[in-house]
Amino acid sequence: MREKYESLSATVLRDLAKSRGIKNTSTMKKADLVEAMLAEDAKKEKEKAAKESEKKQEQSAPSEKPERKRADSAESAKEGSKEGEREEASQDDTIKNLDSGITVNGILEVMQDGFGFIRSDNYLPGENDVYVSPSQIRKFNLKTGDIICGNTRIKTQQEKFSALLYITTINGYHPSVIQQRKNFEDLTPIFPNQRIRLERPGSSVAMRIVDLISPIGKGQRGMIVSQPKAGKTTLLKEIAKSVTASNPDMHLIILLIDERPEEVTDIKEAIEGDNVEVIYSTFDELPEHHKRVSEMVIERAKRLVEHHKDVMILLDSITRLARAYNLTVPPSGRTLSGGLDPAALHMPKRFFGAARNMREGGSLTVLATALVDTGSKMDDVVFEEFKGTGNMELVLDRKLSEKRVFPAIDIVKSGTRREDLLLDPDELEAVEIMRKAYNGMRADEAVENILNMFARTKNNKDYIAMVKKNRII
């Protein structure tokens, strides 16, 4: 019973205690309320035991009718069981009376003090947040990022937030399933070996090029390196559309940090689906806001991977995320060129480094954009720090976009590590022929030649056949 009482919030316990006739409940703390309830239970148990012992003594006296004695003992046992049932029923009735009938569904954020809140709007604090008690968090092994579905208790005038009365599902599963899950950190990371096809009927040439030059696998840690106005946001939108079309079961989270509000609306309207979430923090928000949103998103993705699901995060951009951490992190006393604190890179690296393919099942793919040649030394330092951490790079060239060559992909500099695990033997051979052919060319010439060849073919299969047949670009 102790566990049952501890799983309830203090206000629910207080109401239960009042209904049982316990006095001075308003001044009691939760621990005192639990003890008082247990003492009341013990008192009732003693009374019940005393009654039963009296009946036994009566039955032990010599009687002319043993049959009647058996009947009396059976009746007393029935009465005892009925009393227990009545107690449980009264507790259930009390919980039903406290139930507001309002169902809450949102993401949990566990605070440092042990309690938590269910956030509903854009993963951030709001007026409609619901309080979750520390006992509920401990009992069900809840973590930040879990999606909680349950009913709230009737809110009193003194309370600022509604409180969670009971939980029905966690991440769409029964609460008993959640306690058996493994931690994200305990899963085994391996190289991406399942390909995410970006080419689809009616897809742009950009997706066909990326599918061959820089193939993306489940669990890829990719970086889209771009100068301003090179078309990185358009490319991200194309990738998102291709992923939702080719992998509808994959959970897609688009995280926009320090972006323009109109771009947020554009992406929200352009990419829709059951497994698509667009989370944002626009440039007019505080750096703390950017930091909090990004941490909630990565925790949400980890919880999904723990359930062996495939998740993809499209982050725009990791440079601005690092800038936000640079403004919020306590100064370490050291400074890199451009005014960047080395301690500010820890959390963005944790975010980017969370991408991995799991041997036990599930994967987390992160594609992040990085800005270069912005005129800020800090942006270049951030890019250099992240350069060796990814296993896929897609480089966009502003010179190509200025010449109106789209997509402005620098094919020479773009590529994927261990692409042999993702490409077919025919595709691998065609890519090698292409790379050898344009090795001595200028970037714009190589891209224009390849675009002409892509324009002459309907799909990548025809393109590969043409490259293998001609042996030259």
Residues covered by each model-derived region:
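N-terminal "pre-motor" subdomain/linker immediately upstream of P-loop NTPase catalytic cores
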Residues: E83-I178
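Short flexible coil/turn linkers enriched for glycine and charged/polar residues
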Residues: S100-I102, V110-G114, L124-G126, L142-D146, ...
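Charged, low-complexity terminal tails
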Residues: M1-G101, Y123, N128
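P-loop NTP-binding catalytic core
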Residues: I154-I224, A230
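Phosphate-interacting basic helix/loop segments used at nucleotide- and nucleic-acid interfaces
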Residues: K96-V104, V205-I209, V297-K302, F351
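P-loop NTPase catalytic core
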Residues: G231, A240-V243, L252-D274, V278-I473
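P-loop NTPase nucleotide-binding module
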Residues: G202-E259, I298
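Flexible glycine-/small-residue-rich
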Residues: M37, L108-Q112, S120-N122, P134, ...
